């Protein structure tokens, strides 16, 4: 436990009164309504964490709406998810992001000069759900559907700094300890062994303010965050695994750091991914996308040129810092009685280092981005786009789910 303040405001959980947080958000429900967006893959419906999340959300009566951004391939899958979420008693809507109606809307946008047809995945789904949520929300919280350690106060912690009139933050990101107390293991390898040493490496090459900003976040890759609808309308959302990093870069460009904060969410665990044997799968795919996003940040925000020699230096320094961190985490784990496999951690650092070289070379040859357009631009082309998406969701329910 500490009370250190980073470059951005850090809200610690010394003794947060969760009941008071909920009461205050409830009191602001009319003037500052809050929504929650949950991106979900169809296969996650069968995972135990989602059932508990729904049970806990039923106690979050301060939420005006829950928007489920669903990736499903068939009508049967869509109907199954709609039926599954009937246990959620809060006002909610299931957005079938791959459904024929929304696909047609996306295709029609191409005629207006906004081509989203090549985008797919979580980023696109979050973008669609954000448009719908901003119709009636002052603030929007986001979190995934696989949180094992979910609790009723998680959305409240994310939303309170945004809706509280004495604070008025524009953006709030969660941070936590990725520790499983049942198995006594330390997780979060992509952040611990890749993102943090990479940021330290990049900062040593260029003392840019945006890198200082990134280093201030205690868990850069946290998928739990909240923001005002106004900010959500003005940021470009990345469409790949660089979502969390790219989003932070967009927030930096659109909001003063005085209005950005992070909050302690305690212990956290979720479904884990395998390392993968190449850059197209598992954690290696994630690391590749994240590294590419950071290279784009360096290109846009510093004087550094992404050359072969620059990438070689990054590769060497990253690997050294990663190996140094393994020794530190081993000491931390040993003192806390946590299981820690140093050999396995070394394997991860070696693999991540190889990804840096390959992803860096790819970026040099093709530095194009994978950012969705911001909603402000989309509405300038199609003013009623949000309403069209909402109406498509309602029509999907009527056609596929209501008994004839």
From Swiss-Prot:
Q: Where does (2R)-3-phosphoglycerate bind?
A: 188-190
The record lists the catalysed reaction(s) as: an NDP-alpha-D-glucose + (2R)-3-phosphoglycerate = (2R)-2-O-(alpha-D-glucopyranosyl)-3-phospho-glycerate + a ribonucleoside 5'-diphosphate + H(+)
pH-linked activity: Optimum pH is 7.5-8.5.
- Relate the protein's function as given in its record: Involved in the biosynthesis of 6-O-methylglucose lipopolysaccarides (MGLPs). Catalyzes the transfer of a glucose (Glc) moiety from uridine diphosphate (UDP-Glc) to the position 2 of 3-phospho-D-glycerate (3-PGA) to form glucosyl-3-phosphoglycerate (GPG).
Q: Might you give the EC number(s) for this enzyme?
A: 2.4.1.266
Q: Which cofactor does it need?
A: Mn(2+); Co(2+); Mg(2+)
Listed A to Z, the keywords are: Cobalt, Glycosyltransferase, Magnesium, Manganese, Metal-binding, Nickel, Transferase
Q: Which domain of life is it from?
A: Archaea
Q: Which residues bind a divalent metal cation?
A: 146, 270
What InterPro entries does this protein's entry cite? GPGS-related, Nucleotide-diphossugar_trans
What name does this protein carry?
A: Glucosyl-3-phosphoglycerate synthase
The gene name on file is gpgS
Provide the cofactor note recorded for this chain's UniProt entry.
Answer: Requires divalent cations for activity in the following order of efficiency: Mn(2+), Co(2+) and Mg(2+) ions.
Manganese among the record's keywords?
A: yes
Q: Which residues form a coiled coil?
A: none
Source species: Methanococcoides burtonii (strain DSM 6242 / NBRC 107633 / OCM 468 / ACE-M)
């Amino acid at each position: 436990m500490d009370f250190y303040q980073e470059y951005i405001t850090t809200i610690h959980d010394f003794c947060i009164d969760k009941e008071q947080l909920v009461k205050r958000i409830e009191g602001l429900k009319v003037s500052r309504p809050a929504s929650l967006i949950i991106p979900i893959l169809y296969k996650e419906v069968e995972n135990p964490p989602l059932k508990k999340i729904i049970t806990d959300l039923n106690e979050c009566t301060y939420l005006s709406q829950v928007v489920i951004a669903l990736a499903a391939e068939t009508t049967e899958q869509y109907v199954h998810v709609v039926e599954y979420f009937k246990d959620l008693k809060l006002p909610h809507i299931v957005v079938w992001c791959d459904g024929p109606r929304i696909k047609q809307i996306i295709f029609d946008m191409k005629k207006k000069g906004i081509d989203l047809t090549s985008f797919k995945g979580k980023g696109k789904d979050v973008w669609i759900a954000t448009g719908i949520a901003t119709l009636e929300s002052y603030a929007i919280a986001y979190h995934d559907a696989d949180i094992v350690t979910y609790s009723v106060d998680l959305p409240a912690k994310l939303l309170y700094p945004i809706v509280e009139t004495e604070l008025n933050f524009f953006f709030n990101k969660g941070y936590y300890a990725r520790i499983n107390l049942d198995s006594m293991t330390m997780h979060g390898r992509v952040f611990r062994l890749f993102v943090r040493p990479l940021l330290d490496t990049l900062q040593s090459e260029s003392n840019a303010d945006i890198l200082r900003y990134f280093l201030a976040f205690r868990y850069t890759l946290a998928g739990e965050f909240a923001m005002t609808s106004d900010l959500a309308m003005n940021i470009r959302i990345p469409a790949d695994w660089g979502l969390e990093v790219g989003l932070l870069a967009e927030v930096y460009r659109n909001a003063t750091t005085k209005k950005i904060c992070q909050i302690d969410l305690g212990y956290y665990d979720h479904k884990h991914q395998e390392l993968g044997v190449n850059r197209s799968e598992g954690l290696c795919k994630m690391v590749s996308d994240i590294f590419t996003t950071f290279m784009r940040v360096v290109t846009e925000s510093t004087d550094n040129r992404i050359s072969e020699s620059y990438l070689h230096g990054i590769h060497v320094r990253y690997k050294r810092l990663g190996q140094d961190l393994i020794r530190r985490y081993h000491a931390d784990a040993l003192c806390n009685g946590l299981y820690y496999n140093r050999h396995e951690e070394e394997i991860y650092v070696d693999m991540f280092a190889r990804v840096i070289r390959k992803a860096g070379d790819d970026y040099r040859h093709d530095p194009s981005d994978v950012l969705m357009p911001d909603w402000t631009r989309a509405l300038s082309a199609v003013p009623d786009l949000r309403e069209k998406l909402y109406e498509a969701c309602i029509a999907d329910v009527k056609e596929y789910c209501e008994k004839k």
